[in-house]
Amino acid sequence: VSLPFLFEIGVEEIPDWMIPDALENLRVLFEKLEIPYESVTLDATPRRLVLRAEGLPARQADSQERVLGPAKSAPAQAVEGFARKQGVKPENLAVEATPKGDYYSFIRKVPGRLTKDILAETLAGIILQIYFPKTMYWTGKGGPRFIRPIRWIVAMLGDQIVPFELAGVRSGALTSGHRRLGAKEIAVTPADYVQRLRDHYVVLSAEERRNRIRDGLAGVRLKPDPALLETLVYLTEYPTPIVGSFDPQFLELPEEVLVTVMRHHQKYFSVEDAQGKLAPQFATVMNIDADPEGFVRRGNERVLRARFNDARFFWETDQKKKLANRLPDLAHVTFQAKLGSYRDKTKRIMALVKELGGKALAVRAARLCKCDLTTELVKEFTDLQGVVGGLYARAQGERAEVWQAIYDHYKPESMEDAIPRNLAGRYVSLADKLDTLRGCFRVGMIPTGSRDPFALRRAAQGVVRIIVEGKLDVSLDALLAPDASKHAQPPAPGPRPPAPEPPAPAPPPPAPGPRPPAPGLRPPAPEPPAPAPPPPAPGPWPPAPGPRPPDPLRDFLADRVRFYFKDHRGFQYDEVNAAMAAGWSNLVDLEARLVRIRTLRATPDFEPLAASFKRIRNILVQAGFTGGGAIRQSLLEPGPELELYQEFTQIAGQPIESVISKLRPKVDLFFDKVLVNAPDASVRQNRLTLLHTLLAEFSTMADFSEIVTNS
């Protein structure tokens, strides 16, 4: 028998942004029950989370269970007791070999349980396991926790109620309609559930609510805002769009201010005229069926007028004091308790901008970029920080490069957002984000899987995007090793031991292009009479100048670099790993090498040569060979070995793209005909040196052994 299943959790209004993730979490928890079903549908409104499934069996399938009994060597009495417990005769028992010896065993049939009973035992636990960033007690401390108080639960398998209780709420077949327009109690079944809700002014489907809003505003030129649309979908159960207007005199305020007031504080869409300019209108959604007398529309207009009047007052009042004169006020605005004030942060940003190579205008923008935090407009509308500073700077006569840099310095705020439009803005934004990252990691505020209060992941992703997309030739190794005193708290009275000296900045990797021959390759010369030294002790490949100390910030940023190039730019994961293994301090250089790798990968010689490089690496690691000494020509045997050496001397220093077709057949022939681990120690050493030199030559572009090949 195939049965429909209806499960509804009725609650007080859930925050709109939590609903989609909660639904997906509910799906996962239901699937973990491993109850067969044909299809499952999840829906939600602010007051309910709903799972509907079709095709559940009335009873689970029978199964078998292996029961292990006494050892074969056990007394007959023990064997008979085990058989009696299983309801069979001793001769019906099987003997099974185990790691501990031979044991009697029995395969017994386990009847399938009623699906209704399984659901009754598990649904309460599923409700409490749904993840929300914050939860609350509503029955007293120590009781169940959920995002909002649970008011009713519907749980039905076919036409039968699945009985259970949670926090005093018993499951049943009664749901609730719209808070104002519908009945408080509505009897439902899985078959009529959706229509019964619709009869009581609840549109269950989010897609249907979305279309209802779109269709109702089809004749209005809205400023595109998909995120606001999603917010309104999950704020309402019966959305009905309305359009209002405001005094055109408010259009004298900057558009950014008006749009922010409407969008972030009132959940209104902005409306554009035929020329694409802001019109004195707005659109919003009410959670009722109609507004025939216009009461709701006029109420929204009245609220918006008050908001706009506040914004105009703040705009005019703030401009009586220049941004530069607000700089001392930043000393009273705390950035973070352990990292000082925003005045301290401003000084660090200015120093970093200079370190990055920013000129006078960039330093000027860095000096003023945080001053708008002391303005009344930003205190009231915090989403406008940065933007307001740029607008005030423009109104106060700052040059375009300065005010645009201030305006843009919080960008990019998402992967879809653009980076700052000019070089000064990129320097200021990069310095601001780097300062936040360095400071927070220095005082131990490192993001976890569920907590990132300072949005450090977004800051790190912004660092990567600004450097790569802004083509900034900077060394991250140098920027990630700042003077510790820059983020230290003010010293306490009395002597303090000096801070350790910072490590020297690492030089950026060489730009793509011709390079001098790799170490170990020399022109023909008289050979030393001394025999080749024995191979050095085993060590890592490629050889490193020394172990890098643990650096959580560097590792954190490396993850963001991988994410950017793999998920955002579409490079293969092994391409990213290969290029980063050769160095990633200079992200512009890393991008160029990744483009070259992707181009090379399309050639027929690439994968076989990459497989050969992997083979070379494995040989060197197994031999414990880390380089040293020159290639001795007198020890090279005529044939494939000498030909590989001669080919290499001709192509050394050239980009791999131009030589791959010549190099690959020589490498293949070498491995087919030459025994690397020759019995003669000198010959073996010389062949390892040849392979090491060959691999090192091309490892400045990538560690090709990281490439996954079909070979």
Regions found by a protein language model. Give the residues of each.
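Amphipathic alpha-helical "coupling" segments that flank catalytic cores
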Residues: V1-P516, L521-S711
